[in-house]
Regions:
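Acidic/polar, glycine-enriched structural segments that form the non-catalytic walls/loops
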Residues: 1-70, 90, 102-109
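Solvent-exposed, acidic/flexible segments
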Residues: 9, 25-32, 36, 73, ...
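Sec-exported extracytoplasmic/periplasmic mature domains
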Residues: 21, 40-47, 85, 101-105, ...
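Extended, well-ordered alpha-helical scaffold segments
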Residues: 31, 35-38, 92-103, 162-178, ...
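Carboxylate/His-rich catalytic cores and anion/metal-binding grooves
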Residues: 36, 43, 74-118
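Alpha-helical support elements that line or immediately flank enzyme active sites
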Residues: 42-45, 77-93, 144-160, 164
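Short, solvent-exposed loop/turn and secondary-structure capping segments
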Residues: 44-55, 83, 93-96, 181-184
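The feature captures the catalytic groove of carbohydrate-active enzymes
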Residues: 55-70, 117-165, 169, 173-225
């Protein structure tokens, strides 16, 4: 049966009340306070669908359906979700993690075909299905950072089912790929293969991002199992 406008208004009001009651901030500065509440509003309005809202414009494109860049750019996209767990809005991270988890079979295929490696490879730029762009294969670290997003979600929710069915499978595949990036050399130490740092194009051996995320990712995988 159809709902009258008052019933829709009431359910709408209750849904938003639930959102605002979970957390609040007071920086002592109206401008900063408003930025926080606006960010939470944007997240709740655009991160509840099948696909995550994109980092630029989300649902509010200024030029009709034209969206610059058209893809998910990891270095930008991840920042939308960093504050949501601390704000108590774990459910708003789900669409992003679902998007990444559903791309895992293709990421495993890319690891095999591009690197002749085990595990899963996700780079900076992906399309709507989560499939990698062909131009960023030297950018190795996004898959590790995404794995840690799964871990953060588990740490905040303590959801064992999520850990076993989603987080750990993703973390382990990321760790398996990262293992292939490290080579033991004549000095007895493991060194990272050449890769680009963040959005740069210069290939770096023993890049800081590879080394740091290898340590954190392996430790996280062991802790998770």
């Amino acid at each position: 049966p159809g709902k009258g406008i008052e019933m829709h208004r009431q359910s709408h009001s209750e849904a938003w009340k639930s959102i605002w009651n979970r957390s609040f901030v007071d920086y002592g500065d109206d401008y900063l306070n408003n930025l926080w509440y606006l960010t939470m509003y944007y997240a709740n309005a655009s991160q509840g669908g099948k696909y995550p809202g994109r980092f630029n414009n989300g649902l509010w494109g200024w030029n009709r359906d034209v969206q610059n860049w058209n893809f998910y750019f990891h270095w930008n996209q991840q920042q939308l979700f960093w504050p949501l767990n601390a704000a108590g809005h774990h459910e708003l991270v789900n669409s992003y993690l679902d998007f990444r988890f559903n791309s895992l079979p293709q990421a495993q295929k890319d690891a095999r075909e591009i690197f002749n490696a085990s595990g899963a490879f996700i780079s900076d730029v992906t399309e709507r299905r989560g499939y990698n762009s062909a131009g960023e294969n030297a950018n190795h670290t996004p898959v590790a950072e995404i794995a840690l997003d799964f871990w953060r979600q588990y740490q905040y929710t303590c959801d064992k089912k999520f850990l076993e069915e989603r987080a750990l499978p993703f973390i382990i595949e990321a760790a398996r790929f990262f293992e292939t990036l490290l080579v033991k050399e004549t000095d007895g130490l493991y060194h990272a293969r050449k890769g680009t740092g963040y959005e740069g194009w210069i290939e770096l051996k023993d890049g800081l991002t590879e080394l740091v995320y290898a340590r954190v990712l392996f430790k996280t995988a062991l802790e998770g199992v």
